[in-house]
């Protein structure tokens, strides 16, 4: 009887270990289908892309629509989705710790980032620009000697504009902010001289006192981002973007991009 009980305990332990192994090694697609919800990191402060509606509490925009389309592809229902607000500093860590399944948040594809995350092929391309107060009289980056440029934390903008300024022989400094509204507020208060980010994002912040300069810097390709450890899920997302690119382009046009 003792032997029989011991064998039963061993069998139970083996079964538990097998189930745990299966769960731990289940692909992300299967995990999403099992829980019935796609969790997506999106911005909530970027007009046209993903902006929080203060009246309804909903985040709306181009990238939200792309996220819904992906949810429909995986789960058959675009409403089976949970949106989590992120910024350039938080989107990576929230993906790393498993809070998010994917990130669709103006996440620029770079060689360095591709070593850490899986990126789909680009679903949208933009270029970095410069938003300034009209009263400053700036016409291009070449006029900005000694200017303080406001950029988002953990974004590619600081590197790109820093390199462009050096090439133009212009000395500039940078102030980093957690979100875009903070940069615009700093520009309006003249705590920074320039607000720099991708041009289509700047379009949501331009007003009668400001203007976007003609300068464009380094094309920015946006990809849907997933964790590096699931190549099958990454391939699924990449195929989704490729097969739906025309419809995604239509969504961008719908949102004025």
Where would I find each of the regions flagged by the language model?
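Periplasmic-binding protein-like
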Residues: 44, 124-132, 199-241, 245, ...
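Bilobed "Venus flytrap"/periplasmic-binding protein-like clamshell domains
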Residues: 39-45, 59-74, 108, 129-178, ...
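Extended ligand-binding regions for polar small-molecule ligands
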Residues: 65, 69-73, 142, 147-148, ...
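Extracytoplasmic small-molecule ligand-binding "clamshell" domains
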Residues: 33-103
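A ligand-binding cleft/hinge motif common to bilobed small-molecule-binding domains
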Residues: 90, 106-116, 160-165, 185-218
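Acidic, polar ligand-binding/catalytic clefts
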Residues: 68, 80-143, 209-216
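Ligand-binding clefts/hinges and TM-proximal coupling segments of bilobed small-molecule sensing domains
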Residues: 27-28, 33, 156-175, 209-216, ...
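Sec/Tat signal peptide C-region and signal peptidase I cleavage site
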Residues: 21-26
